[in-house]
Amino acid sequence: MNARSLSAIITIAKYFDEGELLRIMNSTNGIITVFAGSASRPFAQKMCDYLGVELGKSTTHIFSEGGIYVRADESIRNKDVYIVQSIGKDPNNAFTELIFWIDAFKRASANSITAIIPYFGYAKADKKDEPRVSIRARVCADCIEMCGADRVVTMDLHAAQVQGFFSKPVDHLYASALLCEYARHLGIVNENLVVVSPDAGSAKRARAYANILGCNVAIGDKVRIGHDENPNALEIIGDVKGKTCMVVDDFTISGNTLCKVAYGLMDKGAKEIYAFLSHAIVKEDAVKRIEESPIKMLVTTDTVDNTDVLKNSTKIKVVSAAPLFAEAVRTIHEREPMAYMFEHLPARLMEMSFEDTDK
């Protein structure tokens, strides 16, 4: 730093408090540009609405033989690029498109590239649990980094240790900030509420929710046979008789686990059953199963676009996680601590997250 620059800093310092001055000095010189993969266009648009920026202009084309073509239709040289793409429904094509986007931005001289992956479906494949299988989460992490991503932002990984598969920074967001606030909005948070984990593996998540809401925990004891999506719920550990039960989990595909736990809770005398999930990757049969179950309401986020299959649902409510991801982008861009962000979420974030939920 030369004498002239130092003099300028000393001159302006008297007009700002210490925190504001540090924020200005640390702020990146890049320009935020958000692009959408084909799996997450509505989500990315909501992020842009929150940030007050326009969605990046782009073209995605699927050729007749199934090949994917992507192109940024505006200059991104020296810009900070955020590409939004969930790996949920049709995960193979979604992932391939994501790494093509990252490569395209790298070759177009972006200042930085952040992969925003609202739902990272391959995080379920985090270990070699039988002979001669691939650790798919690690393969995905390697590809994302090799193609040029500088950072990854995702939410509620099925296996949190997947963060360790990346050598670049990973910002791991939590839906609990949104879902617990919506539980309060519903008026179910009181001394009669019990948070229920559908299995022992999710007990840590349930405890985190219970700590936020100030209530007790119960656990569903289940046995999963094979690698299909149809586990057998066996028992409920904990007192749920006459209680309002809030079942929490990271995702559902078939709805089988949730519904079997719900029936188990009813058998134990539960008064009402709600389900709160970070992600839902559902089809018509899963929606039908949930609609016919004892679950009074299922609340999830929009990390995976289920608009078509949920249009006739009376039980499933969707809160938007896009404002939370947008606030994370702002935090990254201004080089602020992510932990501080979660402790000081703006009121407008919750307002935007819930604005379409009760319609």
Segments from the language model and where they lie:
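PRPP-associated nucleotide enzymes
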Residues: 2-359
